[in-house]
Each structure stands twice: as structure tokens, then as C-alpha cells.
């Protein structure tokens, strides 16, 4: 009789433990689903904010380029434009060293600068947006 009692109690304990483990797994999976949903919502909000910032930066850069291309320039504007040309050459030399040397020998005209501005927008905006994303992510993490 003792042996049957020990086996029955052991079986009950094992089945209770198995049910407990199963409930824990379900609970964890439900928490994972909820966490994933909240992360998706946060990412969606972050994506919308970054999209707005990106659009604003693109507009500002295009406006700046069109101002320098179409408008009359003062001496100060001319200096800014020369610095911009130097920055563009430096960026080109980092990305495409063989083409940069070729461009430096023939100089820049206003149309080339405007074209470079739009080509470089994506290359310049990438790190800027990732930095902004990191800052926003840090803020959201601190708020949460």
C-alpha cells in the first residue's frame, strides 16, 4: 500500500509541475507578444517622426541649394559656397577617390553643385537620421 501511495503522490506532483511549467510558458509567450506589439508601436511612432524630420531636412537642403544656384550672392554667400564646394569634394574623395581627383581638376559650376547636393542628400542624411533616431530611442527608453 505504501508503494502505491508514493507512486500516486509522485504522479500528482509531476503532473502539477508540468501544468505549472506549461502555464509559465504561456504566460511568457503572452508577455512576449505584448512586448513585441508595444515595440512595433514605438517603432511606428519613431518612423513617423523620423520621416517628418527627414522631409524637413530634405526641403531645407533643396531650398539652400536653390538659393545658392538661382540667387545673387554676396561675398559672404560666396565664401559659404566655396566651403560647401570643399565639403562636397571631401565627401567625394571619401566615397569615390578616383572620381574626386577628376572633378577637382575641372572645377565646379553651379549646376554640378546642385546635382551633387541632391546626390549627397541621401549619404549625408543617413548618419544624421541614425543619430536622431538614437537620441529619440534613448529618450523613449528613459520615458518608458
Curated annotation (Swiss-Prot):
One of its GO terms (biological process) is defense response to fungus. Pfam families: Bombinin (PF05298). Expressed by the skin glands. This is Maximins 2/H1. Keywords: Amidation, Amphibian defense peptide, Antibiotic, Antimicrobial, Cleavage on pair of basic residues, Cytolysis, Fungicide, Hemolysis, Secreted, Signal. Disulfide bonds: none annotated. The modification Leucine amide is found at residue 143. The keyword Secreted applies. Residues 19-43, 74-123 form a propeptide. It is found in: Secreted. Maximin-2 shows antibacterial activity against both Gram-positive and Gram-negative bacteria. It also shows antimicrobial activity against the fungus C.albicans, but not against A.flavus nor P.uticale. It has little hemolytic activity. Its main location: secreted. Residues 1-18 form the signal peptide. One of its GO terms (cellular component) is extracellular region. The modification Asparagine amide is found at residue 70. Belongs to the bombinin family.
Amino acid at each position: 500500500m505504501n508503494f502505491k501511495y508514493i507512486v500516486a503522490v509522485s504522479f500528482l506532483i509531476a503532473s502539477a509541475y508540468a501544468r505549472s511549467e506549461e502555464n509559465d510558458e504561456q504566460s511568457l509567450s503572452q508577455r512576449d507578444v505584448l512586448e513585441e506589439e508595444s515595440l512595433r508601436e514605438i517603432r511606428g511612432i519613431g518612423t513617423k517622426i523620423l520621416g517628418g524630420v527627414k522631409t524637413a531636412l530634405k526641403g531645407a537642403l533643396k531650398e539652400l541649394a536653390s538659393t545658392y544656384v538661382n540667387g545673387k550672392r554676396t561675398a559672404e554667400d560666396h565664401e559659404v559656397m566655396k566651403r560647401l564646394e570643399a565639403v562636397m569634394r571631401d565627401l567625394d574623395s571619401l566615397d569615390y577617390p578616383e572620381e574626386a581627383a577628376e572633378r577637382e581638376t575641372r572645377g565646379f559650376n553651379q549646376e554640378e553643385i546642385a546635382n551633387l547636393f541632391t546626390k549627397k542628400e541621401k549619404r549625408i542624411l543617413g548618419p544624421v537620421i541614425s543619430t536622431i533616431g538614437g537620441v529619440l530611442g534613448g529618450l523613449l527608453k528613459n520615458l518608458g
